[in-house]
């Protein structure tokens, strides 16, 4: 846990005092004795993950091809091509199974 000095705003360090441990500031003379166990937990709020392929809307108007799904063996798959690397590299082809119950995604 990191506490800050109320006087100057710098981080406080823990040092051993005469009677107990204490929070002390290296910049100014602020000192606060620690008389009990200090705990504090804060869990950060997680961001929603953005689908880098554009989510479900990206697959609405794409073509399908005769590519077999590796998961369910369905004979057709939707596909789209994106440039994921530098311009001198070939485009990456992304597939999505046409079987509505499967919907498996993979890339070539």
From Swiss-Prot:
Localization per record: Nucleus
Ranges annotated as C4-type zinc finger: 5-28
Alphabetized Pfam families for the sequence: Zn_ribbon_RPB9, Zn_ribbon_TFIIS
GO cellular component annotations of the record: cytosol; nucleoplasm; RNA polymerase III complex
Biological processes, Gene Ontology terms: defense response to virus; innate immune response; transcription by RNA polymerase III
Positions bound to Zn(2+) 2: 69, 72, 98, 102
Keywords per UniProt: Antiviral defense, Disease variant, DNA-directed RNA polymerase, Immunity, Innate immunity, Leukodystrophy, Metal-binding, Neurodegeneration, Nucleus, Transcription, Zinc, Zinc-finger
Motif (Hairpin) on chain: 88-89
GO molecular function: DNA-directed RNA polymerase activity; nucleic acid binding; zinc ion binding
Zinc finger (TFIIS-type): 65-107
Source domain of life: Eukaryota
InterPro entries: DNA-dir_RNA_pol-M_15_CS, Rpa12/Rpb9/Rpc10/TFS, Zn_ribbon_RPB9, Zn_ribbon_RPC11_C, Znf_TFIIS
Amino acids binding Zn(2+) 1: 5, 8, 25, 28
Assembly behavior: Component of the RNA polymerase III complex consisting of 17 subunits: a ten-subunit horseshoe-shaped catalytic core composed of POLR3A/RPC1, POLR3B/RPC2, POLR1C/RPAC1, POLR1D/RPAC2, POLR3K/RPC10, POLR2E/RPABC1, POLR2F/RPABC2, POLR2H/RPABC3, POLR2K/RPABC4 and POLR2L/RPABC5; a mobile stalk composed of two subunits POLR3H/RPC8 and CRCP/RPC9, protruding from the core and functioning primarily in transcription initiation; and additional subunits homologous to general transcription factors of the RNA polymerase II machinery, POLR3C/RPC3-POLR3F/RPC6-POLR3G/RPC7 heterotrimer required for transcription initiation and POLR3D/RPC4-POLR3E/RPC5 heterodimer involved in both transcription initiation and termination.
Disease as annotated in the protein's UniProt record: Leukodystrophy, hypomyelinating, 21: An autosomal recessive neurodegenerative disorder characterized by global developmental delay, loss of motor, speech and cognitive milestones in the first decades of life, and diffuse hypomyelination of the white matter and atrophy of the cerebellum and corpus callosum observed on brain imaging. Clinical features include nystagmus, ataxia, dystonia, and spasticity. Other more variable features are feeding difficulties, poor overall growth with microcephaly, optic atrophy, and seizures. The disorder is progressive and may lead to premature death.
Its biological purpose: Core component of RNA polymerase III (Pol III) which synthesizes small non-coding RNAs using the four ribonucleoside triphosphates as substrates. Can mediate Pol I proofreading of the nascent RNA transcript. Anchors into the Pol III active site to constantly monitor transcription fidelity, cleaves mis-incorporated 5'-ribonucleotides and restarts the transcription process. Once Pol III reaches the poly(dT) termination signal, can induce Pol III clamp opening and transcription termination.
Domain notes: The TFIIS-type zinc-binding beta-ribbon domain contains an acidic hairpin motif (residues Asp-88, Glu-89) that likely coordinates the nucleophilic water and magnesium to cleave the scissile phosphodiester bond and release the mis-incorporated 5'-ribonucleotides.
Protein family membership: Belongs to the archaeal RpoM/eukaryotic RPA12/RPB9/RPC11 RNA polymerase family.
Protein name, entry field: DNA-directed RNA polymerase III subunit RPC10
